[in-house]
UniProtKB/Swiss-Prot annotation:
It comes from Francisella tularensis subsp. mediasiatica (strain FSC147). It comes from the Bacteria. This is Protein GrpE. GO terms for biological process: protein folding. It is found in: Cytoplasm. InterPro entries: GrpE, GrpE_coiled_coil, GrpE_head.
Amino acid sequence: MSKQEKSNVEDKSLDIETAVQVETAQESASGALEELSVEEQLERAKDTIKELEDSCDQFKDEALRAKAEMENIRKRAERDVSNARKFGIEKFAKELLPVIDSIGQALKHEVKHEEAIAMKEGIELTAKMLVDILKKNGVEELDPKGEKFDPNLHEAMAMIPNPEFEDNTIFDVFQKGYMLNGRIVRAAKVVIVKN
């Protein structure tokens, strides 16, 4: 007998052994079921149903948790997008503030020559346009003269005594502050009254 024929015979004998084992297992399982009483079979069926119901409840719970997590992720993403829209120009606005300050300082100087007066009026219009554009995009100017000092909005540069005003009243403003949609971009630099 060749090696190939021996191998085929061995494979067939293994297949026969496996088939016999499977058939024996099936017979013993069906025999065991037949040996169980109807009450025992009913009890086993109830146990199986209970296990399946528990599994189903667990899957439902996991599905609800996954749904809640997805909802939280969606809300967080919406909030992040909203904040990106609201505060996306913050850096740009911060960089423009010194320009606005410089224009404001230039406009404080008095001019007498007609050409200089006309130029000053043009600069005033340009400054107004710039401030209007910033306002349109959520940037608000803080000019707190006469208000109570708030360390969240103001930076105290100096304190002076003045009996005409209450303590912590803002007497003068060195540099205006700015907010972007309720968030401080730059605190106002102020002089406060301290008696």
